[in-house]
């Protein structure tokens, strides 16, 4: 008994947090950087951005269905026949959507059908519970520096990503540049897994495993434990990048100028001795749609600066696709006097603020797009922005809509639910007025059937 206890305690002591590699200086031309990826892409003068919301496997399945549906609607971008799935430059993923986003970045168009086989058809949730209840994992879970969030990372490694780091992803990705987001539970701030963001922590993102970022983004509080990230701020000479300095010169009193200062001169993480660690949880708590990443950039830069940046990269069209897997918040508690259950209270505590914040982000983004396009009428080189919003709530009234909106947030869905979400994605893409308008403006390639009919007509 004493020997067994000694082995147990020894195992616990061996499980310690492994810090991410630090940097001694910022290297702006190296690493997994968003701006570098944009500079190296855009061969067709069109910037295509995908956004996959949170929502567990429901979100991953709906996003996968949208990518599959886009392949049925080819379009012309600068005379080149392509699809949005094949042409995506950036993908933002949050919580369940981050699983698909990271895999899409790694495999590109081959995400179809690989992701369905490797993830959607697997009972990922059962595998997780099996690991959590395994006797062999109990010593590790007894460690104060190892938790269920770390087990989630291991399961993502076993199922999808292996030991791939962001350095590997930077070298070998076949798809769009992925921005995975989590939430710092102490500050409530969004943490994007890009080297631009990790510069402030004086950390080398290339050393971090992709599965850890996805696990952090997916770590729903209470169900999973937070994932730890070390903070080395103040030890690499980091300053606000030169490209941002211009927007900080003004001391005006406008709300936008105050917001710029708040975003760019945030001192919260500057003292790594006071805050040596971050504890990361579900990215959906701060930005369940992924839209805030773009809204923050719009708040930092004046439209004239954004215009100049896009023109410098020869971009004349921006396409933003938002896939929103938000389900129906139960209203049954309003139909009876009985005190809601503990589960109902937990769900309301998490889901209601997320739903309200998502609606506000959606309204702000639509207003931003409208204002941008209105300003382009007088631009010397107009840059058209298309916003394709695809939400389960936009499905037409039908049994399918009812079923889709009542699919729970879990990491396993039965085959029927996966098929419902794929069918829902087809309908949303087909009925989207924004997507159909984009196809009209960009041009639709001739289908083989139409070409054959035209050839027959010419013969006669």
Residues covered by each model-derived region:
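Sec-dependent bacterial lipoprotein signal peptides
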Residues: 1-13
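Catalytic domains of lipid- and phosphate-ester/thioester hydrolases
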Residues: 12-460
């Amino acid at each position: 008994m004493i020997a067994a206890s000694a082995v147990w305690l020894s195992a616990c002591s061996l499980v310690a947090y492994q810090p991410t590699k630090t940097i001694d200086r910022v290297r702006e031309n190296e690493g997994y950087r968003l701006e570098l990826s944009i500079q190296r892409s855009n061969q067709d003068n069109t910037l295509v951005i995908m956004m996959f919301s949170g929502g567990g496997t429901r979100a991953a399945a709906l996003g996968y269905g949208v990518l599959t549906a886009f392949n049925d609607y080819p379009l012309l971008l600068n005379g080149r026949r392509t699809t949005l799935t094949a042409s995506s430059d950036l993908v933002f993923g949050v919580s369940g959507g981050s699983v698909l986003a990271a895999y899409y970045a790694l495999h590109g168009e081959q995400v179809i059908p690989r992701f369905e086989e490797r993830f959607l058809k697997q009972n990922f949730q059962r595998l997780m519970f099996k690991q959590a209840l395994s006797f062999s994992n109990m010593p590790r879970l007894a460690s104060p520096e190892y938790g269920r969030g770390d087990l989630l990372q291991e399961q993502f490694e076993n199922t999808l990503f292996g030991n791939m780091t962001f350095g590997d992803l930077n070298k070998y990705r076949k798809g769009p540049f992925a921005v995975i987001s989590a939430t710092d539970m102490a500050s409530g701030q969004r943490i994007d897994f890009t080297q631009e963001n990790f510069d402030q922590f004086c950390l080398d993102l290339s050393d971090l495993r992709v599965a850890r970022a996805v696990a952090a983004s997916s770590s729903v509080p209470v169900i999973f434990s937070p994932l730890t990230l070390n903070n080395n701020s103040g030890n690499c000479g980091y300053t606000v990048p030169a490209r941002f300095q211009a927007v900080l010169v003004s001391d005006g009193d406008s709300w936008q100028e105050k917001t710029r200062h708040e975003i760019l001169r945030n001192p919260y993480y500057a003292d790594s001795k006071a805050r040596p660690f971050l504890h990361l949880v579900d990215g959906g708590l701060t930005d369940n749609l992924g839209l805030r990443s773009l809204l923050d950039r719009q708040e930092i830069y004046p439209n004239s600066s954004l215009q100049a940046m896009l023109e410098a990269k020869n971009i004349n069209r921006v396409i933003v696709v938002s896939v929103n897997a938000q389900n129906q918040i139960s209203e049954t508690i309003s139909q009876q006097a009985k005190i809601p259950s503990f589960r109902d209270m937990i769900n309301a505590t998490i889901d209601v603020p997320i739903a309200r914040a998502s609606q506000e982000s959606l309204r702000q983004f639509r207003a931003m797009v409208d204002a941008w396009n209105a300003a382009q009428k007088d631009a010397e080189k107009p840059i058209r922005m298309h916003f394709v919003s695809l939400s389960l709530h936009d499905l037409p009234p039908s049994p399918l809509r009812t079923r889709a909106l009542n699919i729970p947030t879990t990491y396993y869905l039965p085959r029927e639910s996966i098929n419902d979400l794929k069918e829902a994605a087809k309908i949303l893409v087909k009925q989207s007025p924004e997507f159909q308008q984009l196809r009209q403006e960009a041009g639709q390639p001739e289908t083989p059937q139409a070409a054959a009919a035209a050839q027959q007509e010419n013969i006669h």
